[in-house]
Amino acid sequence: MKIRNSLKSAKVRDKDCRVVRRHGKVYVINKKNPRMKARQG
């Protein structure tokens, strides 16, 4: 999982990427390609 300042670039890397909020943190998840996971921080 990558830790990024901005998730905009992480979101557009793949069309299956989703932005979700969990426990006050923002994540990009991708069920089809888990290598695309990222967290904002």
Curated annotation (Swiss-Prot):
Q: Name one GO molecular function term.
A: structural constituent of ribosome
Kindly state a single biological-process term from the GO annotations of this entry.
translation
Among the entry's GO cellular component annotations, what is one?
ribosome
The answer, when asked if Ribonucleoprotein is one of the entry's keywords, is yes
- Superkingdom of the source? Bacteria
> Which keywords does this Swiss-Prot/TrEMBL entry list?
Ribonucleoprotein, Ribosomal protein
Return any one Pfam family short name.
Ribosomal_L36
User: What PANTHER family does its record include?
Assistant: 50S RIBOSOMAL PROTEIN L36 2, LARGE RIBOSOMAL SUBUNIT PROTEIN BL36B
The entry sums up its family as follows: Belongs to the bacterial ribosomal protein bL36 family.
Q: What is this protein called?
A: Large ribosomal subunit protein bL36
The scientific name of the source species is: Gluconacetobacter diazotrophicus (strain ATCC 49037 / DSM 5601 / CCUG 37298 / CIP 103539 / LMG 7603 / PAl5)
The organism's lineage is: Bacteria, Pseudomonadati, Pseudomonadota, Alphaproteobacteria, Acetobacterales
